[in-house]
Amino acid sequence: MAAAGVTAGAWRYWPEQGFWNPCRARLPRRLASHELVARAWEGLDSTQVWDCHAHLIGTGDSGSGIVLNAHMDSWLSPVQYARRLFFLNAGCAHEAHEGVDRVYVERMHNLIDGMRPGFKLVLYAFERAHDERGMPDPEHSDVYVPDAYAERVAKADPQYFEWVASIHPYRADAVHALERAKRGGARGVKWLPSAMNIDPASARCDSFYRALSRLDLPLISHAGLERAVLGRGAHDYGNPLRLRRALDAGVRVVIAHCASMGEDRDLDKGPNGPYVESFALFARLMREPSYERLLFGDTAGMTQLNRAGPALSRVIEEEAWHSRLLNGSDYPLPA
């Protein structure tokens, strides 16, 4: 009886199309012509509509430099292996026996062609985890997507893509790499602190923050619980309050997903402060007048089952925040 109850309760969360992405060429007509879709585009200049949070994934089979952790290709690590399959299926590259990098990019072309003219995706590079000495830690890096590859893909199809760099601030060449990314047209820098082993509140980030401010590049940093990419698993580094150091240095900060999942310590009440919802800490930062022109959030993934809820309702209802929210999908995760 208990098992039946659990099954019945879970059924309401079962996706209509199942858990495997059917990889349709375009949005079905009944959805593309739906009244809500038409209203969403109403009054918008589609050339100004970007998906500001999209991940560039592959296997490195094109010479891209992408590296997947060996555990993601081994049945001996079933969770990691399944994660790889889900990511590739989400990007419709799961059946590509060769040319996975190419097929993944072609799928994004296909999806953009189904949008309004001028729409773009902002593609993210993804840095390795690094140790405290600033050296790469491949054993604890789930995926590595080089800046050079993200730049190359974006520049090959500028009508489709922009790109964002990913640079670990502990690297000896971090500022130099940031300056190089700026010259290459990067629109910002992406961090996933818990996976990459970055403490945003560390003084080791100060020179990087000064460079970000000088170059007028935003920092897009994940905050709150992370489940898709584990890496070093340093969850405390995803606390939204740890980004105060960047904000106080004059850096524009985009808190990815509006920190809409998980709990973190309330560091404003001391290092051993109580755990509260990560989103509540994001909301606190958004209320601070000194951060009004510096702090933003993105909506990436917030409509997904694991995030949809009170946080999504709040960002919709909080009209004062709307001019500080960036549109994002967290592609390919929605697929």
Feature map (PLM): residue ranges:
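Active-site gating/metal-coordination segments in enzymes
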Residues: 26, 32, 120, 125-236
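Hydrophobic faces of well-ordered beta-strands that scaffold small-molecule active sites
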Residues: 50-54, 121-123, 162-165, 189-191, ...
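N-terminal export leaders
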Residues: 1-5
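H/E-rich (His + Asp/Glu) clusters that bind or coordinate divalent metals
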Residues: 18, 26-32, 261-335
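Distinct, well-ordered alpha-helical segments
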Residues: 172-182, 200-206, 231-245, 264-288, ...
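An N-terminally biased module of ancient metal coordination in phosphate/nucleic-acid-related enzymes
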Residues: 9-124, 130-141
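Catalytic metal-binding/acid-base residues of hydrolase active sites
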Residues: 53-57, 168, 194-195, 224-226, ...
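A structural motif corresponding to the C-terminal end of an alpha-helix
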Residues: 111-119, 150-161, 248-252, 285-295
